[in-house]
């Protein structure tokens, strides 16, 4: 019986040491991949911003040209209304006005089409940016098992200073309180007949949930226990 107990103790310590190494390796992978992804996203967003700036400048130019044509049309109409000369001169002025008006109409059509195209390009770029963000999010969800493990056990710290207790502290909850912990009593580690117990956990966790976590700890091992603990702590107040 004693040998089996020692085997369980050795196994648990080995699991914790392996988990610690996995977390350290996974953290390096996470940092490297996040940095690379951030660089790619930053480069992509800068290209989009540069393209949008160019489109905006072109749009301002087109709008300015349209305003100029409108002012010119207004001046021409006013000049014709004030025209007081011979029929021949009036006819020449009118013919010139009609030619110029037709030319301006065609130019305005071209400018309006250019403006419509620019507005469509703006909308297309905005959609591309949104799709790229969604792609990055989907890619992150498909990342390697190491990153998934680290995210599930995000910020895990293991305190083995007390030989009778193991303290697991989780951080990065994104709230005002930045850490939550659970303490496991391992004083009976070398006795197979005595299951491991949770000595201390956050006050918001119910007794029935504690019992469920202890069952996971004793039946499924320390890694699955820690994953389930973090899920519970995330939900607890």
Swiss-Prot record:
Its main location: nucleus. Residues 8-134 form a coiled coil. It is found in: Nucleus; Chromosome, Centromere, Kinetochore. One of its GO terms (cellular component) is Ndc80 complex. It holds the Pfam family Spindle_Spc25. Keywords: Cell cycle, Cell division, Centromere, Chromosome, Coiled coil, Kinetochore, Mitosis, Nucleus. InterPro entries: Spc25_C. It comes from the Eukaryota. The keyword Mitochondrion does not apply. One of its GO terms (biological process) is cell division. Component of the NDC80 complex, which consists of NDC80, NUF2, SPC24 and SPC25. Acts as a component of the essential kinetochore-associated NDC80 complex, which is required for chromosome segregation and spindle checkpoint activity. Belongs to the SPC25 family. This is Probable kinetochore protein SPC25.
């Amino acid at each position: 019986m004693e040998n089996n107990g020692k085997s369980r103790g050795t196994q648990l310590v080995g699991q914790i040491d392996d988990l610690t190494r996995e977390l350290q390796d996974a953290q390096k992978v996470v940092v490297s991949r996040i940095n690379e992804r951030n660089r790619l996203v930053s480069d992509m967003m800068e290209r989009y911003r540069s393209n949008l700036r160019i489109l905006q400048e072109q749009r301002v130019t087109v709008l300015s040209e349209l305003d100029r044509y409108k002012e010119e049309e207004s001046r021409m109409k006013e000049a014709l209304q004030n025209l007081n000369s011979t029929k021949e001169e009036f006819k020449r002025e009118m013919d010139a006005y009609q030619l110029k008006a037709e030319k301006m109409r065609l130019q305005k059509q071209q400018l309006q089409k250019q403006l419509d195209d620019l507005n469509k390009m703006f909308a297309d770029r905005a959609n591309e940016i949104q799709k790229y963000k969604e792609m990055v999010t989907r890619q992150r969800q498909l990342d390697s098992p190491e990153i998934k493990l680290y995210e599930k056990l995000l910020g895990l710290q293991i305190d083995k200073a007390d030989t009778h207790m193991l303290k697991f502290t989780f951080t990065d909850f994104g709230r005002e309180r930045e850490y939550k912990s659970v303490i496991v009593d391992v004083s009976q580690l070398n006795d197979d007949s005595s299951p491991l117990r949770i000595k201390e956990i956050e006050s918001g966790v119910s007794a029935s949930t504690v019992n469920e976590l202890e069952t996971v700890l004793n039946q499924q091992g320390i890694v699955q226990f820690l994953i389930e603990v973090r899920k519970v702590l995330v939900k607890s107040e």
